[in-house]
Amino acid sequence: VIKLDKPIVAFEDAEDGREDKAPRKIIRLADEREVQIKVAFSMVSIEGAKKNLNLELEHWDFDTVRKEAENKWENYLSRIEIEGTDEQKINFYTALYHLLIQPNNVADVNGQYKNAKDSVLLSPFGIYYSTFSLWDTYRAAHPLYTILTPELLPDMVNSMLLHAECQGYLPIWTLWGKETHCMIGNHAVPVIVEACLKNFPGIDVEQAYHLIKKSLTVSHFKYDVEAYDRYGYFPFDIVEE
């Protein structure tokens, strides 16, 4: 959903000879010198996107939005202070910024989300995290989340458990709530186990154990238990990488 602070006087097809799958449009405004645009997404519905837009950003004060974003980032980036040269600080805080741009809450403001099977559900905790690049992040990023952003950990883990309840095994590499199956293995396991061993609140340890055991002992796409038990690894001619 897109909303502008200037009236639209014309909405035309872009005739540039390109054959894109999505239609390309040209918007004509009464005053084209300066325009502010709000954009909102929803994985559930257009109505959901409208609600997200209206509740998450009610005003048109650009400077206020910029300051609010600055304050939010300052809250997270200031949790670690380092000493060094300006270049070293730039490199470090850029890496810290990259750490914090995912995972993403893909639920609407009302807590609705689409699960791995495209069913619309209501998150029991109002949030549903996705963009779990777990084979990249289980080694260092997720352990750092337990130290740097502990308030976010239970919702991350519970999102993984919701995903596993739906598709039958823990997430491999999720994007917009769907499984991409990028890479083999079960890298969600150490992430969940660490959170449980560190006694993060709000996590059902028995449920976590059940889903971990099921993910490790029941074959699923790119995970052949019999092949692994026989060879101790996944042969490329038996298990697709």
Task: Show the residue positions of the predicted features.
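Acidic/polar, glycine-enriched structural segments that form the non-catalytic walls/loops
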Residues: V1-Y128, L162, Y169-I172, G202-F221
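A conserved hydrophobic secondary-structure block that centers on an alpha-helix together
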Residues: E19-D20, S130-T131, A141-H142, P150-P154, ...
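A general alpha-helix detector
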Residues: N52, K72, Y76, T137-R139, ...
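Stable alpha-helical elements in mature extracytoplasmic
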Residues: A69, D136, L152-M156, A188, ...
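Secondary-structure capping and boundary motifs in well-ordered enzyme cores
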Residues: E87-Q88, I127-D136, H181-A188
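Alpha-helical support elements that line or immediately flank enzyme active sites
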Residues: T94-A107, S130-L153, V193-N199
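Flexible glycine/proline-enriched surface loops and loop-helix/loop-strand junctions
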Residues: S123-G126, T137, A141, W176, ...
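Active-site lining segments of carbohydrate-active enzymes
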Residues: T180, I184-E241
